[in-house]
Amino acid sequence: MARYIGPKCKLSRREGTDLFLKSGVRALESKCNIEAAPGIHGQRRGRQSDYGTQLREKQKVRRIYGVLERQFRGYYQAAASKKGATGENLLQMLECRLDNVVYRMGFGSTRSESRQLVSHKAISVNGKTVNIPSYQVRPGDVVSVREKSLNQLRIVQALELCAQRGRVEWVDVDAAKKSGVFKNVPARSDLSADINENLIVELYSK
């Protein structure tokens, strides 16, 4: 299945919110009008049905984490089979993806760039090279930039950006060594309040 490689701004405009698909050099709002949907009639956002609202929420989360539809459905099915709230389980599984953890630690300026670092074998987990972006990181795992990639300019710049915006509390990073520990799976209260995972559960429960 093909991965979307078009304008990132267009996706954020589609969802009407900043999906953090571009680096933090400049705020997305200064680069594109996220209040207007893409296309020639973008100024008009029609009233959505319940299904449309649920679908948009699913698409928003899928695009934030850079996951294709088939894979996203697989995450949902796995989340539904676990104990606890399905929506919370889903978000936690997405947060534990290696490409997302690399982004959270600040080694990549975006999740897309972080996924590329993983795919290009620039990242190790517990001393072993892992090139699978969907790899599930566990509490206590040590995620590091491999020696061959330590001096990559984009990693240095990403760490500088991360230092400016701040790091999440569930990772502990030594920026000088470009290595960090995934301390724990984040609780729902630690994650974005702008996501309504219950809409996704309602969508897939039909």
UniProtKB/Swiss-Prot annotation:
This is Small ribosomal subunit protein uS4. Part of the 30S ribosomal subunit. Contacts protein S5. The interaction surface between S4 and S5 is involved in control of translational fidelity. CDD domains: S4. One of the primary rRNA binding proteins, it binds directly to 16S rRNA where it nucleates assembly of the body of the 30S subunit. With S5 and S12 plays an important role in translational accuracy. GO terms for molecular function: rRNA binding; structural constituent of ribosome. Belongs to the universal ribosomal protein uS4 family. GO terms for cellular component: small ribosomal subunit. Residues 96-156 form the S4 RNA-binding domain. GO terms for biological process: ribosomal small subunit biogenesis; translation. The gene is rpsD. PANTHER family: 30S 40S RIBOSOMAL PROTEIN (PTHR11831), SMALL RIBOSOMAL SUBUNIT PROTEIN US4M (PTHR11831:SF4). Keywords: Ribonucleoprotein, Ribosomal protein, RNA-binding, rRNA-binding. It holds the Pfam family Ribosomal_S4. InterPro entries: Ribosomal_uS4 (IPR022801), Ribosomal_uS4_bac-type (IPR005709), Ribosomal_uS4_CS (IPR018079), Ribosomal_uS4_N (IPR001912), S4_RNA-bd (IPR002942), S4_RNA-bd_sf (IPR036986). It comes from the Bacteria.
